[in-house]
Amino acid sequence: MPKEFSRTQRVAQQLQKELAMILQREVRDSRLGMVTISDVEVSRDLAYAKVFVTFLCIGEQTPESCLAALREHEVQIRMMLGKQIRLRLTPEIRFYYDNTLVEGMRMSNLVTEVINSDKRRKHEAGRDEDEA
């Protein structure tokens, strides 16, 4: 019976859980706002981890400024992660902004615009036929 998940996927899931806990409880930085880890990709040799994050920015904060603040804590977060997980080597962590949520909202708005435009055209075409 084959394994459902490869080791890298299991490690990625565990890293996601542990990083979420670390960011929630240990990292104190007012520049971050609320951070959500949307995905973690681990290299095959488990040496590197790409951590995709989204932010709930407050006030003057932008996703770019929040990401810059988070990147300042990469070494500290990696040290805390090394204490939490049992791996021979703690992966080097790189944070990336995940814009899939923003892109999804943009696409949804475009679809809504097209539907509304189509309804307006049909309504206007129906009115023109009534007048003729």
From Swiss-Prot:
It is found in: Cytoplasm. GO terms for cellular component: cytosol. Monomer. Binds 30S ribosomal subunits, but not 50S ribosomal subunits or 70S ribosomes. Its main location: cytoplasm. Coiled coil: none annotated. One of several proteins that assist in the late maturation steps of the functional core of the 30S ribosomal subunit. Associates with free 30S ribosomal subunits (but not with 30S subunits that are part of 70S ribosomes or polysomes). Required for efficient processing of 16S rRNA. May interact with the 5'-terminal helix region of 16S rRNA. The lineage of its organism: Bacteria, Pseudomonadati, Pseudomonadota, Gammaproteobacteria, Vibrionales. GO terms for molecular function: ribosomal small subunit binding. Keywords: Cytoplasm, Ribosome biogenesis. Pfam families: RBFA. Disulfide bonds: none annotated. The keyword Lyase does not apply. This is Ribosome-binding factor A.
